[in-house]
Amino acid sequence: MNASGTFFFVVGPSGAGKDALMDGARAALDDNYVFARRVITRPEGAVGEAHEAVSEAEFARRQRSGEFLVTWDAHDLRYGLPCSLMSELERGRHVVANGSRAVIAELAQRLPRFVVVLVTAPQDVLARRIAARGRESGEQIARRVARTGAALPPEVRCLTVLNDSTLEVGRARFVEALRHGTRVASDGAPASRTNLMAKLRGEPLDQAAYVAVLQDAMAGRYTEAELTEFLVAATRSLDDQEVVALARARTVFTPRIKWDEPIVVDKHSIGGVPGSRITLIVVPIVAAYGLAMPKTSSRAITSAAGTADAMETVARVDLAHDDVRRCVAQARACIAWNGRLNHSVVDDVMNAITRPLRLDSRRWAVASILSKKYTAGATHVIVDLPYGPQTKLATRADAEALGAMFEHVGKGLGLHVRALVTDGSRPIGRGIGPALEVRDVRQVLANDPCAPADLREKALRFAGEIIAFDARVGSPAEGLRIATALLSEGKAKAAFDRIAATQGARPEPVAPGAHTCVVSATMQGRVAAIDGLRISGVARAAGAPRELGAGVDLLCTIGAKVESGQPLYRIHAGSDAALAAAAALARAGGECSEAVRIDPD
C-alpha cells in the first residue's frame, strides 16, 4: 500500500479543545484535507462530535471483517477509524483524525507518513473549560487536569498546538500545524541536524545555528526524542554568550513591536511567593509618573493566582494588540493577559518537553523571557528574583547568579535590565487568591492604615527602581521618594482606576468568596513559619484561581504570639462543597494541615 498523503492523529487532554479546533480547520482548509468520521458505540445525536453510531454487535462484526484501520476503548465506549481512510491517503489527500494515545504506536508502524498533533493548554485553562461544562465537581476537575498522558513513542513525529487563547487564535495555530505537517515526512533529514548533533556533543552554537534548529523544530522535522536530547544537552552546556545567541535567535521569529516612546518599561518575576501582587501597585505608580508600561502577564498554572487572574477581578484582561496601544496612549499602561499577545511558537514546542521532564532550564528561560520582552518593544526591564526554601531559587547566591545572567543577556539584546534579589521565604500580603490579593492591592493604593506593610514596601522599592530608569531622576533613592509621593498623594490610585477603566472595568470588583471558615491554632506559642506551598494548596482546594473569589486570608504573621484557638487564617470559597474540600485539606492531617507552624514559647 503506497500512501502518499499524511495522516494527522490529533490527541490531547480533556478541555484542550480538540473538537473545536478541528471544526475550524475543516472550514479553513481545502478539499485536500479529509476529516475522519469515527465509528462509535454511542447513540446517534448524543452530545459530542458528529459520528457514525453503531451497536456493540455491529462494531464487533466490522472488527471481525477487518473494516477498521484501528480501534480502541474509552469511557465504556468503542471507537474505530475505517479502513477507507487508506484510500484517501493513496490519492494524496491528508487525513485528520481525533484519537487515543493508546494506538499511536500501532498506527505509526502502519502509516509511512504519520504525524501526531498534540493539542494542549495550561492546567488552569483546562480546568476552566471543564468547569464550564458543569458536569464535574472542583475536586474531580483538579484530579482530571493533574493527569499526565502516556509518553509518545520516541520515533513519532509530533507537532504541539497550544490552545490557551481565543478560539480564533487556537484554530489559526492548528491550521498552521497541519500545513507544516504535510512537509514533515517528505523533507528528509532536517538541514540543521549537524547543528543539533554538535550541541549533543557539548559544543556551543551561534545565533544562526540556533535559528536553523528552532525552525526545523517548529516545523516538526525532529522527533520528540531528538528534541529531548537537544534540550537536555542545552541545560548542561549553555555558556553566557550562547544564552545571548539563543535569545537573539528567538527574536527572529516574532516582529518587534514599535513604540513611539524613549522608555518602554516591563517587569518580570520568576514567582514562587504566595501573594506578592506588587505588579498591580507598581504599574499604576509608574504610569502616574509618566513612563509607558504595557505589562502583559500570565495566569496561574500551579499557584493560587497569577497577575492576570488578579487583574481580572477588576477589569478585562484579554486584550488584543490594538487594545494595548489604546491603553498606553490613554492611561500610559495596561495589565493584560499575555495569552493573546506574547505567544511563542518556540515555547509551544520546547515547553511540551521541558515541563514534564522538570529540566533545570533556567538559562534557556532567561533567553525565552528576555527575547519576548524585546519583541514586545520593551527598552528597560526589571526582574524580581525571590529566593527561599520553596521558591525556584533556593539561596541568595542562586538568585544573584541568575540576576547577573539576566543583566548580561539583556545587554546582549540592547536592553537595560535590572535584576533585584528579594526574600521569598514567606508570603507577602495577607490575601492568597485573586480577589483577596487585589483587596490588599487596593488597600495599599488607598493608603489604608490596614494595608499590608510588606506588600507596600516591596512595591515601592520596585517602582522606585523603575522610575530611576529615567536619567533625569538620578538614583533609585530619588526614584523611591517620587514613587512614595505618587502613592501617598493618591495619584497611583487614580492611575490604577484609569487603567482599569481603559481596559474595561467591572461594575464592581469580584468580592472574596462568601462561604468561609476559620482555621485556628491548636496550641499556644509563636508563629515560626508560614508554608507558602501548603497555604497555596488550601487556596487552590477552595477553588482559586478558577473561582476568582476563592483563597486564603492570613490572620497571623511570622513571629506573632498566638493562643490556642486563635484564628490563623480564613478560607474563602464560592460554594459549600469547595469550602469543605479546602477545610478538610487544612485540618485533617493532609499535606496542608501544617501551613502555619507554631513553636512553643
UniProtKB/Swiss-Prot annotation:
Q: What name does UniProt use for this protein?
A: Bifunctional ribose 1,5-bisphosphokinase-thymidine phosphorylase
* Pathway(s) this gene product operates in, as recorded in its UniProt entry: Metabolic intermediate biosynthesis; 5-phospho-alpha-D-ribose 1-diphosphate biosynthesis; 5-phospho-alpha-D-ribose 1-diphosphate from D-ribose 5-phosphate (route II): step 3/3
Which residues make up the binding site for ATP? Answer: 12-19
Q: Name one GO cellular component term.
A: cytosol
Lineage runs:
Bacteria, Pseudomonadati, Pseudomonadota, Betaproteobacteria, Burkholderiales
- Example of a GO MF term: ribose 1,5-bisphosphate phosphokinase activity
Database matches in SMART domains: GuKc, PYNP_C
Keyword Nucleotide-binding in record: yes
The record lists the organism as Cupriavidus taiwanensis (strain DSM 17343 / BCRC 17206 / CCUG 44338 / CIP 107171 / LMG 19424 / R1) (Ralstonia taiwanensis (strain LMG 19424))
Among the GO biological process terms of this entry, one is:
pyrimidine nucleoside metabolic process
